[in-house]
């Protein structure tokens, strides 16, 4: 079986990691955000200070983790990463914060999932660079203050509305990541193909970009899966025909919609009036959070669904799409 990949001396994991850009100048998309971030980083370096705390928010797969890593590289400081669900008690947070050196970057993914007791400990760490820890029990309880070096907290969330106002307001640099344009996705897919040493036709790149939902993570995942089909079929190049066939087998339609998206749309189509998210969740046997994070943002972006105070409503554009593609039942 022939392979369209480069020599096997490089592991698959290494190649996949290299798909991510390592500096702001190589980051495709989010142009205004990147320009502003460059200004903030340069200003912090000029003052020899830690960068102000950064909050990255937007739908999944748009590059929040990658941006956080790039920021630490641009600042030439260490990068520590954790996530909201892993910080279940104050001691967990203290263990992370006390290992930081001056100006280091601490990245907390899914920061909206921090419980309130952890948030309260984080407030003083972010504002005053210190930790107040309760020592002892009962009447002998006392507060022990631990000083921390100035550091940069970068929080990432797909659910900005779930962050408490006090925590949200402590981020001096809130940055909203938006869906990527078709042209930006084309550039990202081309770069990914080069890193993976996969030969791909221009039309195939465009086919993937059309079905990637404006999301780099999805675009690169589809590229890797299509490459699998090509290698197994003993082909040398990813053509538009092969890409289209592979994507159809993966259940991805021309708009980038998958089975869950179509089930969601069909349910709204067959239900009269606005529908609440809890009702949709029960009907589809899907978690509310998953629907709100991974399904609805793109459907709203392409004007297939509207959110109203009374619930979700299917648009005429979506009804026409479902009818044309004969997927209503």
From Swiss-Prot:
Region spans: Small ATPAse domain (RuvB-S): 181-251
Assigned keywords, A-Z: ATP-binding, Cytoplasm, DNA damage, DNA recombination, DNA repair, DNA-binding, Hydrolase, Nucleotide-binding
CDD domains registered for this protein in UniProt: AAA
Signal peptide (residue range): none
Cellular component aspect of the GO annotation: cytoplasm; Holliday junction resolvase complex
Ranges for region Large ATPase domain (RuvB-L): 1-180
GO biological process, one term: DNA recombination
Residue span of region Head domain (RuvB-H): 254-329
InterPro entries: AAA+_ATPase, AAA_lid_4, DNA_helicase_Holl-junc_RuvB, P-loop_NTPase, RuvB-like_N, RuvB_C, WH-like_DNA-bd_sf, WH_DNA-bd_sf
Gene3D superfamilies: 1.10.8.60, P-loop containing nucleotide triphosphate hydrolases (3.40.50.300), Winged helix-like DNA-binding domain superfamily/Winged helix DNA-binding domain (1.10.10.10)
Location in or out of the cell: Cytoplasm
Catalysed reaction equations from the record: ATP + H2O = ADP + phosphate + H(+)
Enzyme Commission number(s) from the entry: 3.6.4.-
Gene Ontology MF, one: four-way junction DNA binding
Residues at which ATP binds: 19-20, 61, 64-66, 127-129, 170, 180, 217
Enzyme class: hydrolase
Coiled-coil stretches: none
Sites where the protein binds DNA: 307, 312
Coarse class of the protein's main subcellular location: cytoplasm
Disulfide pattern: none
SMART domains: AAA
Residues reported in the UniProt entry to bind Mg(2+): 65
Domain notes: Has 3 domains, the large (RuvB-L) and small ATPase (RuvB-S) domains and the C-terminal head (RuvB-H) domain. The head domain binds DNA, while the ATPase domains jointly bind ATP, ADP or are empty depending on the state of the subunit in the translocation cycle. During a single DNA translocation step the structure of each domain remains the same, but their relative positions change.
Function recorded in the entry: The RuvA-RuvB-RuvC complex processes Holliday junction (HJ) DNA during genetic recombination and DNA repair, while the RuvA-RuvB complex plays an important role in the rescue of blocked DNA replication forks via replication fork reversal (RFR). RuvA specifically binds to HJ cruciform DNA, conferring on it an open structure. The RuvB hexamer acts as an ATP-dependent pump, pulling dsDNA into and through the RuvAB complex. RuvB forms 2 homohexamers on either side of HJ DNA bound by 1 or 2 RuvA tetramers; 4 subunits per hexamer contact DNA at a time.
Subunit structure: Homohexamer. Forms an RuvA(8)-RuvB(12)-Holliday junction (HJ) complex. HJ DNA is sandwiched between 2 RuvA tetramers; dsDNA enters through RuvA and exits via RuvB. An RuvB hexamer assembles on each DNA strand where it exits the tetramer. Each RuvB hexamer is contacted by two RuvA subunits (via domain III) on 2 adjacent RuvB subunits; this complex drives branch migration. In the full resolvosome a probable DNA-RuvA(4)-RuvB(12)-RuvC(2) complex forms which resolves the HJ.
Designated name of the protein: Holliday junction branch migration complex subunit RuvB
């Amino acid at each position: 079986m022939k392979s369209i990949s480069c020599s096997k001396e490089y592991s698959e994991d290494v190649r996949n990691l290299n798909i991510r850009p390592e500096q702001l100048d190589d980051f495709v998309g989010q142009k205004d955000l990147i320009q502003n971030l460059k200004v903030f980083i340069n200003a912090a370096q000029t003052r020899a200070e830690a960068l102000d705390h950064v909050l990255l928010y937007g739908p999944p797969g748009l590059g929040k983790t990658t941006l956080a890593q790039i920021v630490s590289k641009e600042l030439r400081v260490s990068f520590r990463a954790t996530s909201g669900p892993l910080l279940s008690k104050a001691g967990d947070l203290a263990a992370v914060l006390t290992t930081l050196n001056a100006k280091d970057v601490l990245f907390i993914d899914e920061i909206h999932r921090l419980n309130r007791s952890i948030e309260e400990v984080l407030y003083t760490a972010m504002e005053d660079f210190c930790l107040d820890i309760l020592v002892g029990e009962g009447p002998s309880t006392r507060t022990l203050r631990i000083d921390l070096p100035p550091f940069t907290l970068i929080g990432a969330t797909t659910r900005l509305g779930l962050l408490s106002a006090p925590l949200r307001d402590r981020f001096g640099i809130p940055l909203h990541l938006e869906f990527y344009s078709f042209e930006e996705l084309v550039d990202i897919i081309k770069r990914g193909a080069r890193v993976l040493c996969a030969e791909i036709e221009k039309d195939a790149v465009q086919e993937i970009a059309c079905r990637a939902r404006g999301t780099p993570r999805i675009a690169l995942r589809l590229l890797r899966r299509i490459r699998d089909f090509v290698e197994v079929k003993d082909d040398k190049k990813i053509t538009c025909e092969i890409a289209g066939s592979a994507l159809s087998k993966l259940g991805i339609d021309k708009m980038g919609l998958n089975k869950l998206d179509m089930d969601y749309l069909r349910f709204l189509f067959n239900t009269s009036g606005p529908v609440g998210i809890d009702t949709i969740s029960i009907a589809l046997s899907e978690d509310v959070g998953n629907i709100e994070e991974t399904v609805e943002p793109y459907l709203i972006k392409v004007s297939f669904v509207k959110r109203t105070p009374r619930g979700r409503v299917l648009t005429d554009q979506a009804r026409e799409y479902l009818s044309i593609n004969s997927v209503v039942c």
